[in-house]
Regions:
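Sec-dependent signal peptide recognition
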Residues: 1-8
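C-terminal motif of bacterial Sec signal peptides marking the signal peptidase cleavage site
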Residues: 12-15
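Bacterial signal peptide processing site
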Residues: 17-20
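Transition segment at domain starts
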Residues: 25-63
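Short, solvent-exposed beta-strand/turn "edge" segments of beta-rich domains on protein surfaces
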Residues: 46-49, 56-69, 78-85, 130
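One-face residue pattern on beta-strands with alternating periodicity enriched for small/polar residues
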Residues: 67-73, 90, 138
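Extended low-complexity, serine/threonine- and proline-enriched intrinsically disordered segments
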Residues: 87-100, 141
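Short, solvent-exposed, Trp/other aromatic-anchored flexible loops in extracytoplasmic proteins
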Residues: 106-135
Length: 142
């Protein structure tokens, strides 16, 4: 009975070991003006401004590369808020090496709900990306 108990404890403690992530300085993040703010049309054919309104980033060593966890806040602004609507949002994030060659990419497409009476709607979306040493990250919406 004691042997069984010790074996169970061994498996519990062995499976609880964790690997500590080593934080590191995040690489340069660029959002070109033409890709950071755009006008799109909703399902009801009304113009909606979309813009990047904040980015939180956390970076960790991942071998020779850097793992970047991002939270990107997209703000939608419309003038006509008399009815519920949806607006298409496409977010792309790309890491490039020092020669500007694509290294990794993450994209997310969704329809953002705009509640009747709400002129401004924010939504945060999370991403995970690998960045090579000496590389940078490009962020844009379309």
């Amino acid at each position: 009975m004691i042997k069984v108990f010790i074996i169970i404890l061994f498996f519990i403690f062995n499976s609880c070991s964790t690997f500590k992530k080593e934080p590191t300085k995040c690489p340069k993040l660029i959002a070109p003006k033409k890709a950071a703010e755009i006008i799109v049309y909703s399902e009801n054919k009304t113009p909606v401004y979309l813009g990047i309104r904040g980015v939180q980033k956390f970076c960790f060593k991942d071998g020779d590369d850097i793992k970047m966890d991002l939270s990107v806040n997209i703000r939608a602004i419309r003038n006509d808020a008399t009815e519920d609507d949806y607006v298409p949002v496409n977010i792309s994030i790309v890491s490039v090496d020092s020669n500007e060659k694509e290294f990794d990419r993450d994209e997310f497409n969704y329809s953002q709900f705009l509640l009747k009476g709400s002129k401004i709607v924010d939504r945060a979306t999370t991403f995970e990306l690998k960045v090579p040493a000496g590389g940078q990250v490009l962020l844009g919406i379309k």
